[in-house]
């Protein structure tokens, strides 16, 4: 979607002054995330028969970096601690693994993990709340609607249009997305504004038409059946929550938006692709070659009278190359020689590894996040040289994500109580329990917990729960059975054999 063209349309028709130039930078980050930047990955080759194009091979490291950050920050071991039991059950379900409740219906954890990846390539991510099946009065005020359904959208920066920003916090925003209406492309715009304690969510649709200039044109479309143009709620928190990588932006423009986690590592990403492409080309062109004289070959003539030489081995034709006939007497033997190009694997490996180390360092993952030694990948839990850098950066990046998570959960609880008439408490305490296995591996943690349990520093049921994935009740039962068995053995052996 051409977001810049749509922003220009909104600026003209609504009197806004949204900076469209910043979205060109977001588009450049998107290209790197997808692994194809035309100015970098298109190679022109000039031959005797004209110009040819070749696409440079890419490791697509920007996407891998964003995936790794998402897996570190928001994964299956991330949990919520909610003070009110009814609110916790409503959101998370009644089991200790937090695999039920509304968040399961919304596929929250899977989508939130993907949103972190999207936010880290685009610079900003947004959780956006909406409620379907609402009842509204003639003025558009939302009324209690037990039949309503809470929904969440997950938008990257290219879909976020900040309208009001106060002290670096986006208080009003619009969210744009592509859709299809009547089989034709369209744009859906949802605008969140606040005035005097009232929040208004406005829904608009626009038709997209092609123009001879190549720039799309937009026209206001009718509201689809079953949809309202706007709703108003009073006393609600913001129905959206934004977060960005925890770095200070050194790029002008885009107020309210962050910058990509790899925006300062584009040169390193380019170096990685250059090194990898060179490695690949050396392997592709490094096959055995045999140069021979045409006089060594059988000849055949096609229907046009053109003579062709049959190479010594037609099956492996690609290794044979013709040489000009040798000068001298006709009795001189035919010339041929074998050539085995140097693949330069060590040099190429070192170049790729250096580029990966620079990329890892510039993206805050430490110096050796991606280390290939003896054919084995050494991950973050297998090296200690720069783990401290990763720990510090991960702790810093948890802060904005935690703020966004708590903000959207409070908005969900508010809508559940005031609109869906659910028995929940929007003001309950909420905290996030982060997975810190990137600091200490699960095996190391379990081994340490076992030693502490044997030393009597922690209850043995705590170790059993961590080691075997038991619930608290099951762990207590196992510990009691183990204690009873040990006492029985002592009684049986009391007094000797």
Residue locations for each model-derived region?
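Extended, charged amphipathic alpha-helical segments
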Residues: 223-385
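Charge-rich, acidic-biased intrinsically disordered regions
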Residues: 27, 44, 50, 132, ...
């Amino acid at each position: 979607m051409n977001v810049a063209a749509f922003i220009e349309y909104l600026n003209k028709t609504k009197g806004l002054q949204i900076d469209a130039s910043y979205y060109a930078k977001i588009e450049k980050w998107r290209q790197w995330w997808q692994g194809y930047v035309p100015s970098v990955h298109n190679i022109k080759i000039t031959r005797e028969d004209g110009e040819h194009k070749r696409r440079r091979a890419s490791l697509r490291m920007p996407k891998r970096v964003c995936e790794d950050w998402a897996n570190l920050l928001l994964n299956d071991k991330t949990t919520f601690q909610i003070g009110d039991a009814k609110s916790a059950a409503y959101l998370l379900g009644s089991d200790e693994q937090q695999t039920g409740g509304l968040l399961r219906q919304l596929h929250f954890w899977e989508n939130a993990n993907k949103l972190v990846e999207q936010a880290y390539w685009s610079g900003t991510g947004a959780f956006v709340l909406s409620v379907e099946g609402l009842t509204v009065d003639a003025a558009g005020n939302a009324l209690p609607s037990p039949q309503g359904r809470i929904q969440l959208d997950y938008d990257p920066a290219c879909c976020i249009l900040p309208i009001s920003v106060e002290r670096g916090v986006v208080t009003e925003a619009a969210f744009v997305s592509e859709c299809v209406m009547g089989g034709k492309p369209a744009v859906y715009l949802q605008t969140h504004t606040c005035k005097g304690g009232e929040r208004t969510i406005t829904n608009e649709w626009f038709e997209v038409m092609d123009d001879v200039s190549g720039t799309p044109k937009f026209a206001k479309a009718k509201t689809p059946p079953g949809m309202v143009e706007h709703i108003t709620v009073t006393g609600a928190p913001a129905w959206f929550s934004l977060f960005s990588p925890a770095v200070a932006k050194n790029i002008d423009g885009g107020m309210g938006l962050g910058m990509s986690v790899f925006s300062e590592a584009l040169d390193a990403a380019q170096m990685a692709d250059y090194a990898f492409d060179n490695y690949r080309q050396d392997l592709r062109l490094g096959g055995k070659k045999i140069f021979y004289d045409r006089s060594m070959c059988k000849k055949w003539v096609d229907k046009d009278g053109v003579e062709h030489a049959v190479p010594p081995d037609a099956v492996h034709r690609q290794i044979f190359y013709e040489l000009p006939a040798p000068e001298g007497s006709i009795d001189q033997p035919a010339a041929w020689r074998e050539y085995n190009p140097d693949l330069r694997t060590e040099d190429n490996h070192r170049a790729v590894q250096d580029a990966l180390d620079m990329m890892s360092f510039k993206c805050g993952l430490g110096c050796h996040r991606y280390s290939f030694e003896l054919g084995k990948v050494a991950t973050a839990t297998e090296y200690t040289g720069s783990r401290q850098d990763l720990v510090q950066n991960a702790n810093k990046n948890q802060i904005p994500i935690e703020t966004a998570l708590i903000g959207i959960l409070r908005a969900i609880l508010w809508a559940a109580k005031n609109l869906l008439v659910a028995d929940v408490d929007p003001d309950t305490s909420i905290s996030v329990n982060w997975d810190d296995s990137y600091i200490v591996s699960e095996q190391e943690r379990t081994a340490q917990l076992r030693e502490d349990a044997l030393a009597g520093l922690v209850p043995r049921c705590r170790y059993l729960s961590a080691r075997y994935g038991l619930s608290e009740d099951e762990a207590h039962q196992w510990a009691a059975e183990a204690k009873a068995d040990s006492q029985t053995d002592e009684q049986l052996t009391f007094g000797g054999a």
